[in-house]
Every structure is written in C-alpha cells, then in structure tokens.
C-alpha cells in the first residue's frame, strides 16, 4: 500500500510488487494495466493492480511455440496462441523469472520494427509497454504473462493502430485493459438496450420471412441502433444460411436462442478487437516479425 498517488508505471518495483503478492497469496493471480495512454487502463494517474482467484482464458491458452532466453537458462519461454501477442515465462526461481520479465520489458520498450508499424518512440514520445500478469502454481512455478503493447497512432487509425478498429466500435471502442487482455469482455452498458432492439428487429423479420436488408433498413431508422445495422444484416444473413436459406427455417428459434446467437456473434467481434490489439498478427508477416523480436533478445 502507498499513501501517495503515483502514476502508473511498469518497472522493477512494479514487478516486485506482483511477485510479492503471489508469494503471499499463491491462490490469486495479479496483474497491472499498461502504463501508457490508449493501451493502458482508464486511470493512468494512479498506480494500482488487479487480481483474483480466477483462471482467465489467456491462462489456459495453448502454447504456439517455445523459446529460450540464453541469459536465463532457468526460465522457459512460450508464445501463447492468443489474439494478442503474449509471451509466457515459467520458472521455479522467483529471481530468474523476475529478471527475465524485466529484461524483455526493457528490450520491448526500445524495439522498433517499421514493417509491422511498431515504433519504440516518435518525437520523443514512447509507444511500447506491456500488460503484465503473474501467478504462482501449486508446484511452485511462477508464471509471468507479458502482453506486448504499442500505442502508436496513424491517420487511418487515429485512436491507435493496435486499438479496436472503427468497424468494431459499435461493440467496443474503449481501451483494451488488463481484464480484456486476459479474455473477459468488458463491454459498455449501452449495448444492453441496443442489442435488445437488434434482437427485436431480427425476431420480427424472421416471423415475417424477411431478408437481411429488411433488418438493415429498420435499424438505420433508429439513432441508437444505426451503428449496428451493417453488422446485424451480416449476422442475420449468416443465420439464414445456417437454416434452409429462408427466415422460415429459423422462425422456430426461441427468444433465448436468438439472444444467445447474437451474444455469440458479439463474442466473435470481441475476438477481432483483441486481434486488433495484437502487435504481431497471426499471419506469415506477423509471425516473422515476432521471431525477429525474440531473436533480438
């Protein structure tokens, strides 16, 4: 605890705090939001952490690839198969795990790869940081998750290249913080009434054997749902394709079934939002760029 208000910072002291916490409460994980605008939390002026007795989806993610850090032979490295670019460090040695994490964070802060729009700084403004998470397993292994973040902007993406892109703002426009990084969608309250209206329009169109354009047309007449119109048209058409190609084939859907379908589609949008936040994409170019970063360590 600290009686002084200190701005968010990811450094040696912050990592020590995370490790101290899991040593004292090994059944809890703990993490911190990133310490830069756009990729950080909503309160950058106040140093704070978040934790709990819960296993987030990121923690269960498959290992896409393992790597070694020659400076830290006691630490096992892994690239997680996750929408964001997440490195996991594992070790029974607290000291080595902490040092390895600090080493990677320091390297990332100064790393530039223009081919994938990653810039350490522009005009003296830093862009690279991490969202760190630490937990301690029952067998005494420390796990450190480092989500690589970059808050660079562009003319095309003025809110951030690695921030939710405009086509998904109807669902999620806000920053991707610690909880979202780990796989839990924190969505704006406005979606509750808006998606209820989307569902109501889709139900009416199904009942009256309407095509997808009818959904689009109705939603564009309401200022609270116009932002969802194009997406709703797409998922309505997708729903029809899953049946017999007509709305009658899905007319028997219950209200709860339709709501679940819409919410599942929201989840798909959220996964794309997380992909937007990933600095190294899961394509050939992104994989090669990630390998270049690891080789630079």
Which residues are covered by each model-predicted region?
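Catalytic residues for metal-mediated phosphoryl-transfer on nucleic acids/nucleotides
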Residues: 1-34, 55, 76, 80-213
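Short, well-ordered, mixed-charge alpha-helical segments that flank or form enzyme active sites
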Residues: 7-8, 37-42, 60
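Histidine-centered divalent-metal-coordination microenvironment in nucleic-acid enzymes
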Residues: 39-56, 145
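Short, solvent-exposed polar/charged micro-motifs at secondary-structure junctions
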Residues: 39-43, 99, 294-296
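Solvent-exposed, flexible loop/coil residues
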Residues: 43, 62, 91-93
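Cation-handling catalytic/transport regions enriched in His/Asp/Glu
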Residues: 47-49, 63, 69, 80-83
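Helical (often loop-to-helix) elements that flank the catalytic cores of nucleotide-handling enzymes
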Residues: 52-73
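Sequence termini and other peripheral, non-core segments
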Residues: 140-297
